[in-house]
Swiss-Prot record:
<dbReference type="GO" id="GO:0009295">
    <property type="term" value="C:nucleoid"/>
</dbReference>
<dbReference type="InterPro" id="IPR035642">
    <property type="entry name" value="MraZ_N"/>
</dbReference>
<keyword id="KW-0238">DNA-binding</keyword>
<feature type="domain" description="SpoVT-AbrB 2">
    <location>
        <begin position="81"/>
        <end position="124"/>
    </location>
</feature>
<comment type="subunit">
    <text>Forms oligomers.</text>
</comment>
<dbReference type="InterPro" id="IPR003444">
    <property type="entry name" value="MraZ"/>
</dbReference>
<dbReference type="GO" id="GO:0000976">
    <property type="term" value="F:transcription cis-regulatory region binding"/>
</dbReference>
<comment type="function">
    <text>Negatively regulates its own expression and that of the subsequent genes in the proximal part of the division and cell wall (dcw) gene cluster. Acts by binding directly to DNA. May also regulate the expression of genes outside the dcw cluster.</text>
</comment>
<protein>
    <recommendedName>
        <fullName>Transcriptional regulator MraZ</fullName>
    </recommendedName>
</protein>
<feature type="domain" description="SpoVT-AbrB 1">
    <location>
        <begin position="5"/>
        <end position="52"/>
    </location>
</feature>
<dbReference type="InterPro" id="IPR020603">
    <property type="entry name" value="MraZ_dom"/>
</dbReference>
<dbReference type="InterPro" id="IPR035644">
    <property type="entry name" value="MraZ_C"/>
</dbReference>
<dbReference type="GO" id="GO:2000143">
    <property type="term" value="P:negative regulation of DNA-templated transcription initiation"/>
</dbReference>
<dbReference type="InterPro" id="IPR007159">
    <property type="entry name" value="SpoVT-AbrB_dom"/>
</dbReference>
<keyword id="KW-0677">Repeat</keyword>
<keyword id="KW-0678">Repressor</keyword>
<dbReference type="InterPro" id="IPR037914">
    <property type="entry name" value="SpoVT-AbrB_sf"/>
</dbReference>
C-alpha cells in the first residue's frame, strides 16, 4: 500500500527517483516494472506496479468498444499507458508525452494512493489540495454511506 506525498525531482532525461521506502516493495511485487498513464479526470499521471495495472487492463478489456463512453476511457488509458522499468538507482523514465500531459518539468509530487501513485506538478498539486479543502468546507451535498462510516 502506498501512502503519503513526497516531492521528487525529474532529471534532465525525464527520470524520477523512487523514494527508498517504496523501492523494496516495488521490487518484490513487480520486479520494478511499472506502468504510467494519464488520469482522465485530473492533470496528473497514474503510476501502477505492473501486476496492479494488469488488473486494470482486464477490467478495461471487458468494456464495450461499441459504447462511445467506454471506448473513450479505453482509448485514453490504454493509449497513453507506458511501461517503465525501475533501474538499479531506483529511477523511472517517464515518457515525454506523459510529462507534457501533466505539465511535469522539474519538481514533482509523488502521491501514494493505495495501489498506485499519482504524479503531479508541484504547483498544480498544491492548487488541487486547496480546491479540495475549499470544496469540503463548503460542501452542501450529503455524504455517502461509506463516508459517513469513516471516522477520522
Amino acid at each position: 500500500m502506498f501512502r503519503g506525498a513526497t516531492l521528487v525531482n525529474l532529471d534532465s532525461k525525464g527520470r524520477l527517483t523512487v523514494p527508498t521506502r517504496y523501492r523494496e516493495q516495488l521490487i518484490e511485487s513487480a520486479t520494478g516494472q511499472m506502468v504510467c498513464t494519464i488520469d482522465i479526470h485530473h492533470p496528473c499521471l497514474l503510476l501502477y506496479p505492473l501486476p496492479e495495472w494488469e488488473i486494470i487492463e482486464q477490467k478495461l478489456s471487458r468494456l464495450s468498444s461499441m459504447n462511445p463512453v467506454e471506448r473513450r476511457v479505453q482509448r485514453l488509458l490504454l493509449g497513453h499507458a507506458s511501461e517503465c522499468q525501475m533501474d538499479g538507482a531506483g529511477r523511472l523514465l517517464i515518457a515525454p508525452v506523459l510529462r507534457q500531459h501533466a505539465g511535469l518539468t522539474k519538481e514533482v509530487m509523488l502521491v501514494g494512493q493505495f495501489n498506485k501513485f499519482e504524479l503531479w506538478d508541484e504547483t498544480t498539486w498544491y492548487q488541487q489540495v486547496k480546491e479540495d479543502i475549499d470544496a469540503e468546507q463548503s460542501a452542501t451535498e450529503t455524504l455517502s454511506e461509506r463516508l459517513q462510516d469513516l471516522s477520522l
